[in-house]
């Protein structure tokens, strides 16, 4: 695998002030005489943005984001190829990313993260053994990737210094689906650990399945125990041609919601003790674009959001019935082009949408009562943004 070259460049945040109806936006401007902003203020989060690097992007960008004012300040840029998905360790000290390639360059990368400066330092990289890793998570002892074209998931034990050991397990899936173009074989698109920490689900877009695994929480780099064991049942089947993409859980852990890329539907499940019971299917993509993308729930658990791409790009908005998890569509917010990923601030006030083909992250203020979104016209300019993560920062003393 080609060695990753990592360099951190420091940048300032260029602020364009506006008058009347002129839209304000922010972009990167290289620092010359100023040091990187250090320390954090109340209500500030560190924001990391993963990108595709086929254009002008260098890799990962970091910002301070104020979750009360909706303003961002650029911090740093880190060179790494195609970091299309990111995972953050529980203590915020380490960042794990994929390098999404359809060849032997496909990798998982480990970085040490400086929370004060917002900078990353590459620790090491390991081959995934499966092409196009597109999703990555960590439980603290292991890192797991979903490898789209490889039709597999890879497990990497974490060393004491936060770096990754070679893959301890690569689990490959067979099978196909009814869509001959998109489901010609297995395509793993997401891995999620259940709220109780006992199980892991893996979404297989190619076979219309959610694979189930039992987690061994004791598995780590030292004891070399297997992290995953096939569950019973081994998988949950959804309607043919759905194309499972991303899965999320309600804050109370009682419900799971699946966005299907091909059918454009959201499936609601009751979740209990490793089992999924389907309770509802509702349409998010009404124009049949076969491009549904990401799914998230507001921190208060009252609203669910699902992104759609390729046609009528935007965010479908649903209310959640608290006593049974049933969804009701309440609105639709048009966005920039190709909203592959989005995130909601921990306080629930803002949604940030990574619009890959508009080369911006759009910022929307969220109405806590209706769930509806309002564009504040504070776009953050980043080339091909496809993943946004927040890291809470300690308050300054």
PLM segments and residue spans:
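Short loop/turn segments immediately following the C-termini of beta-strands
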Residues: 52-54, 100-102, 148-150, 158, ...
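Beta-rich, blade/repeat-based domains predominating
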Residues: 56, 80-90, 129-142, 174-196, ...
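A short beta-strand motif characteristic of beta-propeller blades
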Residues: 73-78, 121-126, 175-181, 231-237, ...
